[in-house]
Curated annotation (Swiss-Prot):
Binding-site residues for Zn(2+) 2, renumbered to this chain: C507, C512, H525, C531
GO biological process: negative regulation of transcription by RNA polymerase II; nervous system development; neuron development; neuron differentiation; neuron fate commitment; neuron fate specification; regulation of transcription by RNA polymerase II
Biased composition (Basic and acidic residues): 362-377, 401-412, 450-488, 496-506
Family of the protein in this entry: Belongs to the MYT1 family.
Conditions for induction: Up-regulated by retinoic acid.
UniProt-annotated binding residues for Zn(2+) 1: C31, C36, H49, C55
Subcellular localization, as worded in the UniProt entry: Nucleus; Chromosome
Encoding gene (name): Myt1l
Protein name stated in the entry: Myelin transcription factor 1-like protein
Role description: Transcription factor that plays a key role in neuronal differentiation by specifically repressing expression of non-neuronal genes during neuron differentiation. In contrast to other transcription repressors that inhibit specific lineages, mediates repression of multiple differentiation programs. Also represses expression of negative regulators of neurogenesis, such as members of the Notch signaling pathway, including HES1.
Species of provenance: Mus musculus
Assembly with partners or alone: Interacts with SIN3B.
Start-end of Polar residues biased regions: 344-358
GO CC terms, sorted: chromosome; nucleus
Residues the entry annotates as binding Zn(2+) 6: C1008, C1013, H1026, C1032
Length: 1187
């Protein structure tokens, strides 16, 4: 029977273990209880809870099957320390106050909850032994009930784990209740649903706790009866000792910290919800607690030494059972009573308990959000330690039982008990392992959910910050108070999803709580600006901030901006760095006058946004009469212009002609000390209407320098015109770039020493032809009586005015002036003679003798184009430099000019429209007919007149010397356009009915160079004698169709630009080129021959040098051998004395050798015996020398 019961118990245990785990794997860690949505769970109210432990729905269904066996007559132990309890005492209680409120199955709860505390090692040891004995009790119950209660066994095993989680739920519910109670005064009636949900949750928890206590009471009563039967049936003292150990386990577990914490939590819950517990319950609880303490002390003694007195055992058992049953019943009744009162209480009628201070709530709130993962982690670590310590203790306990049984029990009983205890501990160990895994998985899942929620909240906050961002920010004190309030009020609402929206506004930097922000203590700051922890921002959040438009000033972080403290500011307005750079640049350029550049637009233009007044710095002490406003629509164009152009102040002596025209100011700004007076003289006769009738008038001034001097003028008109914002921006930007294109490199010779009053004179005697070509004579003096009353900088300076004035240095006199636009139809052309002297005095010349044209376009835009005449100022020493060679500059100019259809000008840089084939069209839209288009990138004027004389290209009109042309006194002008003589003859020809041929010589040769073009369809009309491709419709189409090569294009351009009249010259030139090529070829052949000869001679020279080197080497070797031979000879003949000679040595070696040679040559002469002996000795001496 024992074996069968063990097998059956083992099967039921394994089933009970596997039931809550398998659904977790199948359903992605969702709660396996059918119909449970995760609310009310102990471990954090997670819908994905992976076990039935802590599930209130599972407990409710389970307790419905078990009805309470007997009523609870006592409700004692919940008000012992009700007055002194607080939030901080939820985990700190005396060990003497709640002994009666124990239940038998708190043994399992105590093992986990005590691990949670991790403070008392002694209690850990006692609990482990208690756990072991409880399992043995369960084993004996299985033995007694053979037909058994498999289902009940399974439910009891689940209850052991569920009650552990239930106690945690009670404590967490109490913590949340403390936080919610504190917020009752701060929340209005909009959040009543949250309190209702919370009350419902607490009521459910209390009901479940009561049912658990009821089940525990029933089980304790059943086990006590079974234990009594078991003790009567067992005959050995070892069984008595074992029963005594079980009773001791029961009484010891009643004193666990879990029950004390539960009691404290219930008392605080009762106080928080207005429920008052009776005092008699408290008194009785205390009395029972004292009696239980006595019995517990007795049991401690009995646990150490087995007692053989049966009466003592029964007395202890009865007292323990009575205390346990009464305590469990009291706990159950208290839970039911509190839940009922809580459900009947209205949330609005609750009052905050007076003994809960704000400090306790703040502390509770701060500890709460991180409590769940910390507790889970500590549970896991403590369970691992418990698992390691369980196995040795079980073995020790089994061995002790065996030793006791050796004297009073047989071997069979001892072996059965030891096997049961080992099986119990193995099962307990398996359950703890599963619980450990569950806690670890739950911890990871909670961490992942928190990170995901934080990321989502950061993204939503960033998106929302872009929509409802306002430039105005709260004061520092308001920010601090609000942030501190929100920090206090921020609980963790795990259940209600509506609360998550109120926690989203915070700094998106992970781990940043708002401290250290530039803008103050902002936990809810929604952007990265001002955050000291930007380096910790993950790439996901940075990706959302990549498209933020920031302040374009390099190195600007957004701090110090006038209108906001945002680094996402999109303009230069209000930027302190930009303002400081502009001021420093202006001062630096004012001080250095070595290189002069243009200064066009107002400093105001660079600050297009709001708060301009705060950054307006009056420069050099001159005040501004009219404040400037700038349309915001021009922001992009003004910023573009600011990035491309530089502005500069220039001065020459004490006289300044350059005025910085600031729309719509009346007075202009000056640099030199006398400039302010000059400005008053310029505008002394101004009428108020001339400066105030236009809402937005374009402003530009031309600062044209000649050497270090600065001279400029401003166009003026009495009438004002309304400009669109785009036109104004395009004009200002184009003027700023165009005026950079001219520079006069030499100092003026005869600059006037006093500022001049600039006016213009009307001349009613001038006349124009149908094309608007003027006849302007340089020697014709104009009356200087009529002058315009005022110069106001309301009109833009036309490009032709800038180009002409920048091409020469001019001189101003007091009487010189310029006028308003003139009606050309009333003017008569004047001629000029070739005998006119080149140098003209200032008295005989008007600086602005050219009349101004006035043409109106649909937009009512008037473009005055004054064309001044002036004496030569070192014409041969100046160059006109343009930007036309830069494709980017030309492209930008054209794009800016194309923004307005009413203001269409010739796109050639520096061209004012004069000299065009189609007439004097300042508004010409293309390069066709432009005389300067073919010179792009080339200096317009030669640096020396000698170069002009080498290849003279004159005006083709017979009798015209070039004087009086619209473009100036160009004797070398190569087109009839702009020629006053040609215009007059053409008009006469039209009036007489005969076609005008403006060139009488070589008319047939003057034709359009485009092949097959007869001159018809040209822009300028049917010009058979037109000699360029400009305006030819066939040239463009032919080029597009044929796609001419570069050489062909170059040939056509050369024919058009050089004015070649016929192909004969080309043939002649080709022949000359051929002859030159032939001569060059012959010369090249001769050069090749010479090079060949030179190469041959060089090779021979090298050969000779090599031979000489060989000879030198041989000579050296011979000399070396001769020296050796002479030494040998001297050594050999040292002992031989020739007659009449000294012994041989280096000094007389040559003479000695000569004598010997002579002796051997003429041996006949030396026939005497002495000589023969001498010769024989010499032979013997020389015989040893080898040559």
């Amino acid at each position: 029977m024992d074996v069968d019961s063990e097998e059956k118990r083992h099967r039921t245990r394994s089933k009970g273990v596997r039931v809550p785990v398998e659904p977790a794997i199948q359903e992605l860690f969702s709660c396996p209880t059918p119909g449970c949505d995760g609310s009310g769970h102990v471990s954090g109210k997670y819908a994905r809870h992976r076990s039935v432990y802590g599930c209130p729905l599972a407990k409710k269904r389970k307790t419905q099957d078990k009805q309470p066996q007997e009523p609870a007559p006592k409700r004692k132990p919940f008000a012992v320390k009700a007055d002194s309890s607080s939030v901080d005492e939820c985990y700190e209680s005396d060990g003497t106050e709640d002994m009666d409120d124990k239940e038998e199955d708190d043994d399992e709860e105590f093992s986990e909850d005590n691990d949670e505390q991790g403070d008392d090692d002694d209690e850990d040891e006692v609990d482990r032994e208690d756990e072991e004995e409880i399992e043995e009790e369960d084993d004996e119950e299985d033995d007694d009930d053979e037909d058994g209660d498999d289902v009940e066994e399974e439910e009891e095993d689940d209850d052991e784990e569920e009650e552990e989680e239930e106690e945690e739920e009670e404590n967490e519910d109490h913590q949340m209740s403390c936080t919610r109670i504190m917020q009752d005064t701060d929340k209005d009636d909009n959040n009543n649903d949250e309190y209702d949900n919370y009350d419902e949750l607490v009521a459910k928890s209390l009901l479940n706790l009561g049912k658990i206590a009821e089940d525990a009471a029933y089980r304790a009563r059943t086990e006590s009866e079974m234990n009594s039967n078991t003790s009567n049936s067992l005959e050995d003292d070892s069984d008595k000792n074992e029963n005594l150990g079980r009773k001791s386990e029961l009484s010891l577990d009643l004193d666990s910290d879990v029950v004390r914490e539960t009691v404290d939590s219930l008392k605080l819950l009762a106080q928080g919800h207005g429920v008052v517990l009776s005092e008699n319950i408290s008194d009785r609880s205390y009395a029972e607690g004292m009696s239980q303490q006595d019995s517990r002390n007795m049991n401690y003694v009995m646990l150490g030494k087995p007692m053989n007195n049966g009466l003592m055992e029964k007395m202890v058992e009865e007292s323990d059972e009575e205390v346990c049953l009464s305590s469990l019943e009291c706990l159950r009744n208290q839970c039911f009573d509190l839940a009922r009162k809580l459900s009947e209480t209205n949330p609005q009628d609750r009052s905050q308990p007076p003994n809960m201070s704000v400090r306790q709530h703040v502390r509770q709130e701060d500890d709460f959000p991180g409590r769940t993962p910390d507790r889970s982690y500590s549970d896991m670590m403590n369970l691992m330690r418990l698992e390691e310590q369980l196995s040795p203790r079980s073995r020790t306990f089994s061995s002790c039982a065996k030793e006791d049984g050796c004297h009073e029990r047989d071997d069979d009983t001892t072996s059965v008990n030891s096997d049961r205890s080992e099986e119990v501990f193995d099962m307990t160990k398996g359950n703890l392992t599963l619980l450990e895994k569950a806690i670890a998985l739950e911890t990871e899942r909670a961490k992942a959910m928190r990170e995901k929620m934080a990321m989502d909240a950061g993204r939503r906050d960033n998106l929302r910050s872009y929509e409802d961002q306002s430039p105005r920010q709260l004061a520092g004190e308001d920010r601090k108070s609000k942030s501190s309030d929100s920090h206090v009020k921020k609980p963790y609402y795990g259940k209600d999803p509506s609360r998550t929206e109120k926690r989203e506004s915070k700094c998106p930097t992970p781990g940043c709580d708002g401290t250290g922000h530039v803008t103050g203590l902002y936990p809810h700051h929604r952007s990265l600006s001002g955050c000291p922890h930007k380096d910790r921002v993950p790439p996901e959040i940075l990706a959302m901030h990549e498209n933020v438009l920031k302040c374009p000033t390099p190195g600007c972080t957004g701090r110090g901006h006038v209108n906001s403290n945002r680094n996402s500011h999109r303009s230069l307005s209000g930027c302190p760095i930009a303002a400081a750079e502009k001021l420093a640049k202006a001062q630096e350029k004012h001080q250095s006058c070595d290189v002069s550049k243009s200064n066009q637009a107002s400093d105001r233009v660079l600050r297009p946004m709001c708060f301009v007044k705060q950054l307006e710095i009056p420069q050099y002490g001159y005040r501004n009469n009219v404040p400037t406003t700038t349309p915001r629509s021009n922001l992009a164009k003004e910023l573009e212009k600011y990035s491309k152009t530089s502005f500069e102040y220039n001065s020459y002596d004490n006289h300044t002609y350059g005025k910085r025209a600031i729309a719509p100011k009346v007075q202009t700004r000056d640099i030199s000390p006398k400039g302010y007076d000059d400005a008053k003289r310029y505008c002394k006769n101004a009428s108020p209407s001339s400066s105030t009738t236009s809402s937005y008038a374009p402003s530009s001034s031309s600062n044209l320098s000649c050497g270090g001097g600065s001279s400029a003028s401003s166009t003026c008109s009495k009438s004002s015109f309304d400009y669109t914002h785009d036109m104004e921006a395009a004009h200002m930007a184009a003027t700023a770039i165009l005026n950079l294109s001219t520079r006069c490199r030499e100092m003026p010779q005869n600059l006037s020493t006093k500022p001049q009053d600039l006016c213009t004179a009307r001349n009613p005697d001038m006349e124009v032809d149908e094309n608007g070509t003027l006849d302007l004579s340089m020697n014709k003096q104009r009356p200087r009586d009529s002058c315009c009353p005022v110069l106001t900088p309301l009109e833009p300076m036309s490009p032709q005015q800038q180009a002409v004035m920048s091409s020469r240095c001019f001189q101003l006199s007091e009487g010189d002036c310029w006028d308003l636009p003139v009606d050309y139809t009333k003017m008569k052309p004047r001629r000029v003679d070739e005998d006119e002297p080149k140098e003209i005095t200032p008295e005989d010349l008007d600086p602005f003798q050219e009349a101004l044209e006035e043409r109106r376009y649909p937009g009512e835009v008037t473009i005055p184009s004054p064309k001044p005449k002036y004496p030569q100022c070192k014409e041969s020493k100046k160059d006109l430099i343009t930007l036309s060679g830069c494709p980017l500059a030309d492209k930008s100019i054209r794009s800016m000019l194309a923004t307005s259809s009413q203001e269409l000008k010739c796109p050639t840089p520096g061209c004012d429209g004069s000299g065009h084939i189609t007439g004097n069209y300042a508004s010409h839209r293309s390069l066709s007919g432009c005389p300067r288009a073919k010179k792009s990138g080339i200096r317009i004027a030669q640096s020396k007149e000698d170069k002009e004389d080498q290849e003279p290209i004159r005006c083709p009109v017979p009798g015209c010397d070039g004087q009086g042309h619209i473009t100036g006194k160009y004797a070398s002008h190569r087109s009839a356009s702009g020629c006053p003589l040609a215009a007059k003859r053409q008009k006469d020809g039209y009036l007489n009915g005969s076609q005008f041929s403006w060139k009488s010589v070589k008319t047939e040769g003057m034709s359009c160079p485009t092949p097959g073009c007869d001159g018809s369809g040209h822009v300028s009309g049917s010009f058979l004698t037109h000699r360029s491709l400009s305006g030819c419709p066939r040239a463009t189409s032919a080029m597009k169709k044929a796609k001419l090569s570069g050489e062909q294009m170059l040939t056509i351009k050369q024919r058009a630009s050089n004015g070649i009249e016929n192909d004969e010259e080309i043939k002649q030139l080709d022949e000359e080129i051929k002859e030159l090529n032939e001569s060059n070829s012959q010369m090249e052949a001769d050069m090749i021959k010479l090079r060949t000869q030179i190469t041959t001679m060089e090779s021979n020279l090298k050969t000779i040098e090599e031979e000489n080197k060989v000879i030198e080497q041989q000579n050296e070797s011979l000399l070396h051998e001769l020296a050796n031979l002479s030494q040998s000879l001297i050594h050999s003949l040292a002992n031989i004395q020739l007659p009449h000679m000294d012994p041989i040595n280096e000094q007389n070696f040559d003479a000695y050798v000569t004598t010997l040679t002579e002796m051997y040559t003429n041996q006949d002469r030396y026939q005497s015996p002495e000589n023969k002996a001498l010769l024989e000795n010499i032979k013997q001496a020389v015989r040893g020398i080898q040559v």
